[in-house]
Amino acid sequence: MTISATEALTRCIEHREIFHDEMLHLMRMLMRGEMSPQIASALLMGLRVKKETVGEITAAAQVMREFATPVVTPNPQDLLDMCGTGGDGSHTFNISTTAMFVAAAVGVPIAKHGNRSASSSSGSADVLEALGANLQLSPQAVAECIEATGIGFMFAPAHHGAMKNVAAVRKELGVRTIFNILGPLTNPAGAANQLMGVFHPDLVGIQVRVLERLGSRHVLVVHGKDGMDEASLGAATLVGELKNGVVREYEIHPEDYGLSMMSNRSIKVSNREQSRELVIEALDNVEGAARDIVALNAGLAIYAGNKADSIESALALAFEMIANGAARAKLEEFCAYTRKFAK
């Protein structure tokens, strides 16, 4: 079933949903550059004002996955992605990027999908380069990296070439659109497990249900009640969990796991070098907020990656991997392996 962009815009104005097949058609038009900039921007803003539904986001994510350049691995059902929507305005260091080395040290195979900074002081790609990683890898090289080190990093622009067809519209609009929440839903390696941070509490329930429809295995979607798109030490964290086909929503508190409530002030950064310093500090087991927030998020990743039966036991593993140096060693191993592909 198809629908014209003008008809879709009318639906948005009337606050009516665009159905799945219709959204597939519209999204393919956007990805192929078959929509004028004026209509494309009107449709994106219409969806935003109406508020995108689970069905609309699911269809859009399916199309982005169709158009993506894939990373092919033997067991995508075991892979874990760790990323966030960004846009939380907290300017903290790269917590989930640091936490992936901890989770990988436990044996969770990581296929991280990331980009340069959009709203933060340092995107995942920025800090990984500052740490010495080479990110100019082919899809085959990323797959080899996952096999050899347990970590692969997929630089989003290298895998989503069709996004060039909406880049100018997005830049000119300068506000959030559906594309800001699609990135974490479009892992090129098809990772079936995920720890995703979101910038708004409403997205916790939405994104976990989108991933349910997309066929994910074990997912945690988190939002710190202090506004962070990570599990926070400064407030309770909202969690949407998909496990064994069942969605649950609940809150977790740092004190539940023996962690102290801490302000985010000490983990704010203004550039990638400051972020790099905090990554190293956390992985070197320096006591403080950087280490503890990394351990908390790594614990959630280990649990989502099915290497522990509970968040409590996963958090204990995270602290162990930091204390015994395994997480720092994993960082060095990953960076060294990526440099083998440098031209």
From Swiss-Prot:
- The signal sequence is none
Query: In which pathway does this enzyme or protein participate?
Result: Amino-acid biosynthesis; L-tryptophan biosynthesis; L-tryptophan from chorismate: step 2/5
Q: Which GO terms describe its cellular component?
A: cytosol
Please list the reactions this protein catalyses.
N-(5-phospho-beta-D-ribosyl)anthranilate + diphosphate = 5-phospho-alpha-D-ribose 1-diphosphate + anthranilate
Q: Which residues bind Mg(2+) 2?
A: 229-230
Keyword Metal-binding carried by entry: yes
Superkingdom of origin:
Bacteria
Annotated anthranilate 1 binding lies at 84, 115
Q: Name one GO molecular function term.
A: magnesium ion binding
Which cofactors is this protein said to need? Mg(2+)
Q: Where do the annotations place anthranilate 2 binding?
A: 170
Residues at which Mg(2+) 1 binds: 96, 230
**Cofactor binding comment, as recorded:** Binds 2 magnesium ions per monomer.
Which amino acid positions bind 5-phospho-alpha-D-ribose 1-diphosphate, per UniProt? 84, 87-88, 92, 94-97, 112-120, 124
One of the protein's GO biological processes: L-tryptophan biosynthetic process
Q: Which InterPro entries match?
A: Anthranilate_Pribosyl_Tfrase, Glycosyl_Trfase_fam3, Glycosyl_Trfase_fam3_N_dom, Glycosyl_Trfase_fam3_N_dom_sf, Nuc_phospho_transferase
The record's top EC class is transferase
Ordered alphabetically, the record's keywords are: Amino-acid biosynthesis, Aromatic amino acid biosynthesis, Glycosyltransferase, Magnesium, Metal-binding, Transferase, Tryptophan biosynthesis
Enzyme Commission number: 2.4.2.18
Describe the function of this protein. Catalyzes the transfer of the phosphoribosyl group of 5-phosphorylribose-1-pyrophosphate (PRPP) to anthranilate to yield N-(5'-phosphoribosyl)-anthranilate (PRA).
Read off the HAMAP family from this record: TrpD
Describe the subunit structure. Answer: Homodimer.
Q: Which family does it belong to?
A: Belongs to the anthranilate phosphoribosyltransferase family.
| Name this polypeptide is given | Anthranilate phosphoribosyltransferase
> What is this organism's lineage?
Bacteria, Pseudomonadati, Pseudomonadota, Betaproteobacteria, Burkholderiales
Task: State the encoding gene.
Answer: trpD
